[in-house]
Regions:
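Conserved catalytic alpha/beta core of Sir2/sirtuin-type deacylases, generalized to analogous enzyme cores
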Residues: 1-176
Length: 176
């Protein structure tokens, strides 16, 4: 998993999203991806909300301070010690949401704040079946935003979208 993420490079979809986000001061990316590829494609961290966290660093479960992942993993693997936060003593783990762990409250609040202010909401490459994130398009429509869904397969929200494109992401953005 670690090696896959290290070797991964942004694809045409990541680059197109970066172009969209960077062309509009108020644009914001809400992502479930944990691979840092949006940042690698050029989207500033300040314009990204990572709902499921990020697999490229670690953070304290209590105070949420970030740590470089390499040294944290090394201590755990070499010594079998669960790393603790230098600030508050809390447990440090990879900054992703694990099964059974609740969604990050701050990330969800930021996402909802961005959604209620948007006039266009685009979903790209998601089946829209896992909640609470799957409810974001409906929230956007309820506040009056236009909704675009780009996904290879149909979703349960296609009927409320203003535009639906059932194609591979690379095909949709091939000329961007």
């Amino acid at each position: 998993n670690k090696d896959i993420i290290k070797k991964a490079k942004p694809n045409i979809g990541h680059l197109a999203v970066a172009k969209i986000i960077n062309s509009n001061d108020s644009a914001h990316l809400i992502t479930q991806n944990v691979d840092n590829l949006h940042q690698d494609a050029g989207v500033p961290q300040s314009k990204i909300t990572e709902i499921h966290g990020n697999a490229t660093y670690a953070s304290c479960l209590d105070c949420h301070i970030s740590y470089e992942l390499g040294p944290i993993k090394k201590v755990f693997l070499d010594e079998g010690i669960i790393p603790s936060c230098s600030e508050c003593g809390g447990i440090i783990k990879q900054a992703t949401i694990s099964f059974g762990q609740s969604m990050p409250e701050i990330g969800m609040q930021i996402a909802q704040m961005k959604i209620v202010k948007c006039d266009l909401f685009i979903t790209i490459g998601t089946s829209l079946v896992v909640y609470p994130v799957a409810g974001f398009p409906k929230l956007a429509k309820e506040i009056g935003a236009k909704l675009i869904i780009i996904n290879n397969q149909p979703t349960d929200y296609d009927h409320i979208a203003d535009l639906v494109i059932h194609q591979q992401i690379g095909e949709v953005f091939s000329d961007s």
